[in-house]
Amino acid sequence: MSVDLSSYRDQHFKGSRSEQERLLRLSTTLYVGNMSFYTTEEQIYELFSKCGDVKKVIMGLDRFHKTPCGFCFVEYYTREDAENAIRYVNGTKLDDRIIRTDWDAGFVEGRQFGRGKSGGQVRDEYRTDYDSGRGGYGKLMAQRVVPPPAVV
């Protein structure tokens, strides 16, 4: 039984909607999100290789600082192994964070960089909560120089 596609579509995809759908249905590449900024490539390999042979991991990087920014792409050799990862890894914890996986139409150079104005992920621009696993406050809140909450 194959794993269905989610409703999410990359708005920056270079091509038609039907081409994107076709690539998603054939893809062996996953987008992995909600990762800690401190999760390593080795941890990704260790977790995702439980579902099959991992061909490549591409860590998401801040566009300006070239530091991890909470996402990656995992490419498998087979669709079946990628489907197993979506079935069994999606929604599990890695570095105390519940990660999410989704199909990707295939990694293209340049997509490893965050798309937010500050260089990271867009979702981290507007976050108002303090999240130590994702660099503290969201970028807009951090500009207000708010001290982190006291650790009790």
UniProtKB/Swiss-Prot annotation:
Q: Which GO terms describe its cellular component?
A: nuclear cap binding complex; nucleus
First-listed, main subcellular location of the protein, grouped into a coarse class: nucleus
Q: Where in this chain does the record put each RRM domain?
A: 28-106
In this UniProt entry, which cysteines form S-S bonds? none
UniProt: mRNA binding residues: 8, 31, 100-104, 111-115, 121-122
Write out the GO MF terms. RNA cap binding
Compartments where located: Nucleus
Classification via Pfam families: RRM_1
Would the keyword Nucleus be found if you checked this record's keyword annotation? yes
| BP term (GO), one | regulatory ncRNA-mediated gene silencing
Please name the InterPro entries in this protein's record. Answer: NCBP2, NCBP2_RRM, Nucleotide-bd_a/b_plait_sf, RBD_domain_sf, RRM_dom
The UniProt record lists the keyword Nucleus = yes
- Family recorded in the similarity comment: Belongs to the RRM NCBP2 family.
Q: Outline what the protein does.
A: Component of the cap-binding complex (CBC), which binds co-transcriptionally to the 5' cap of pre-mRNAs and is involved in various processes such as pre-mRNA splicing and RNA-mediated gene silencing (RNAi). The CBC complex is involved in miRNA-mediated RNA interference and is required for primary microRNAs (miRNAs) processing. Also involved in innate immunity via the short interfering RNAs (siRNAs) processing machinery by restricting the viral RNA production.
Q: What is this protein called?
A: Nuclear cap-binding protein subunit 2
